């Protein structure tokens, strides 16, 4: 069993990005600039945004954090999005999700200029991704592809089961795994809460990508010998022994499942760090105008 070390790979990728940024700046080019909008004080969002700002520093990017209280109006938020769309100094920006109930996430996503949508959530980027055109691929699926590549995991002709059908992970992941490219060319099945024979589907899978948000859902009897298991789940489960009061728990019952796998990602330290690195990669592409002029 090989443990897929997302933390180590993410550090490696950040160093590669930093070296490229140093070259750009040495040639008189502009440092990539990532802006982030954070609404309210959601614990998970605070942690993620802090990690993104820190990653920008390591990569040599300029970063800006714009904060609003959770009672900000939808119109005020959309006005800020439009302002960032028109700010030539900002190469890419994100609006950290989830947003308060009174704000339409979809409306916010669609207001972002797709050329600056480094999260890859805008329908234009999602559409381009699904037909294999250059675009900003959403961060978590992109991070998973990077892990498969760096560990040289074979995907062509393999049976891949994606657990979950969210717009952020499940759907794009399924789409990417069936592209005519590496990593891809897999035979993909998407399972979700309404699926029948979900256990049987998993038992036949060479690759399982678990993105349900249900702690310890994937058990030992669901995984065949030699499978590759990618755990996207990060649920905060209360744990009095931890200083934070919670333990980050994946969708896979790691201790039981790991011995059967050829490759597996841990939680934390697997997919999570790669998500942030993918955002950095997209920001670099935006800074270089590599995808959209």
Curated annotation (Swiss-Prot):
<keyword id="KW-0378">Hydrolase</keyword>
<keyword id="KW-0521">NADP</keyword>
<feature type="binding site">
    <location>
        <position position="234"/>
    </location>
    <ligand>
        <name>NADP(+)</name>
    </ligand>
</feature>
<dbReference type="GO" id="GO:0004477">
    <property type="term" value="F:methenyltetrahydrofolate cyclohydrolase activity"/>
</dbReference>
<protein>
    <recommendedName>
        <fullName>Bifunctional protein FolD</fullName>
        <ecNumber>1.5.1.5</ecNumber>
        <ecNumber>3.5.4.9</ecNumber>
    </recommendedName>
</protein>
<dbReference type="Pfam" id="PF02882">
    <property type="entry name" value="THF_DHG_CYH_C"/>
</dbReference>
<dbReference type="InterPro" id="IPR020630">
    <property type="entry name" value="THF_DH/CycHdrlase_cat_dom"/>
</dbReference>
<comment type="subunit">
    <text>Homodimer.</text>
</comment>
<dbReference type="InterPro" id="IPR020867">
    <property type="entry name" value="THF_DH/CycHdrlase_CS"/>
</dbReference>
<dbReference type="InterPro" id="IPR020631">
    <property type="entry name" value="THF_DH/CycHdrlase_NAD-bd_dom"/>
</dbReference>
<keyword id="KW-0554">One-carbon metabolism</keyword>
<keyword id="KW-0368">Histidine biosynthesis</keyword>
<keyword id="KW-0028">Amino-acid biosynthesis</keyword>
<keyword id="KW-0511">Multifunctional enzyme</keyword>
<keyword id="KW-0560">Oxidoreductase</keyword>
<feature type="binding site">
    <location>
        <begin position="164"/>
        <end position="166"/>
    </location>
    <ligand>
        <name>NADP(+)</name>
    </ligand>
</feature>
<feature type="binding site">
    <location>
        <position position="193"/>
    </location>
    <ligand>
        <name>NADP(+)</name>
    </ligand>
</feature>
<dbReference type="Pfam" id="PF00763">
    <property type="entry name" value="THF_DHG_CYH"/>
</dbReference>
<dbReference type="GO" id="GO:0006164">
    <property type="term" value="P:purine nucleotide biosynthetic process"/>
</dbReference>
<dbReference type="GO" id="GO:0009086">
    <property type="term" value="P:methionine biosynthetic process"/>
</dbReference>
<comment type="function">
    <text>Catalyzes the oxidation of 5,10-methylenetetrahydrofolate to 5,10-methenyltetrahydrofolate and then the hydrolysis of 5,10-methenyltetrahydrofolate to 10-formyltetrahydrofolate.</text>
</comment>
<comment type="pathway">
    <text>One-carbon metabolism; tetrahydrofolate interconversion.</text>
</comment>
<dbReference type="GO" id="GO:0004488">
    <property type="term" value="F:methylenetetrahydrofolate dehydrogenase (NADP+) activity"/>
</dbReference>
<dbReference type="InterPro" id="IPR000672">
    <property type="entry name" value="THF_DH/CycHdrlase"/>
</dbReference>
<dbReference type="InterPro" id="IPR046346">
    <property type="entry name" value="Aminoacid_DH-like_N_sf"/>
</dbReference>
<keyword id="KW-0486">Methionine biosynthesis</keyword>
<dbReference type="GO" id="GO:0005829">
    <property type="term" value="C:cytosol"/>
</dbReference>
<dbReference type="InterPro" id="IPR036291">
    <property type="entry name" value="NAD(P)-bd_dom_sf"/>
</dbReference>
<dbReference type="GO" id="GO:0035999">
    <property type="term" value="P:tetrahydrofolate interconversion"/>
</dbReference>
<comment type="similarity">
    <text>Belongs to the tetrahydrofolate dehydrogenase/cyclohydrolase family.</text>
</comment>
<dbReference type="GO" id="GO:0000105">
    <property type="term" value="P:L-histidine biosynthetic process"/>
</dbReference>
<keyword id="KW-0658">Purine biosynthesis</keyword>
